[in-house]
UniProtKB/Swiss-Prot annotation:
Protein name: DNA-directed RNA polymerase subunit Rpo8
Assigned keywords, A-Z: Cytoplasm, DNA-directed RNA polymerase, Nucleotidyltransferase, Transcription, Transferase
Keyword Ligase: no
Catalytic activity: RNA(n) + a ribonucleoside 5'-triphosphate = RNA(n+1) + diphosphate
Subcellular localization, as worded in the UniProt entry: Cytoplasm
MF terms (GO), sorted A to Z: DNA-directed RNA polymerase activity
GO cellular component terms, semicolon-separated: cytoplasm; DNA-directed RNA polymerase complex
Length: 131
């Protein structure tokens, strides 16, 4: 995991792609360093496949991108702490990309605390194929 000037870069592998609850929507599940990330993507723009290696970028600054990347911007909506006995101290951070959701699960520590982010911060989120 790299972090430079509020740009977070995570190396990830796509574990699965499943149908979402809404028509033409899929949910991509990734393992990224110490985090698991799930995000909604519209089927017509899904460029990813299972077991693919990608990088996830989260930044307060606009990121450069190409047609081979999935990028959006939105707001950190909330972070919940799940202290149930099954999960230990698990944190779930939700980002809304104006309707599409990104869910970041940390089993150790608050994602927001680690990266000095706050609820309602405007952020950019990109998933880019490894080149």
């Amino acid at each position: 995991m790299e972090s430079k000037a509020q740009e977070i870069i995570l190396s990830c592998e796509i574990n699965s792609i499943e149908r979402g609850s809404l028509k033409n929507l899929s949910i991509i599940h990734m393992s990224c360093n110490d985090f698991n990330i799930s995000f909604d993507i519209i089927d017509s723009i899904n460029i990813f496949s299972q077991k693919e290696k990608v990088k996830a970028f989260i930044s307060k600054n606009r990121l450069s991108y190409t047609n081979d990347d999935f990028c959006g911007h939105g707001y950190i909506v909330t972070e919940l702490k799940d202290s149930s006995s099954n999960n230990g101290n698990r944190y779930i951070t939700i980002i809304s990309l104006f309707g599409l959701l990104v869910k970041i699960i940390s089993n150790k520590e608050s994602f927001l605390k680690i990266h000095q982010l706050n609820v309602m911060d405007h952020i950019y989120f990109c998933v880019k194929k490894n080149t």
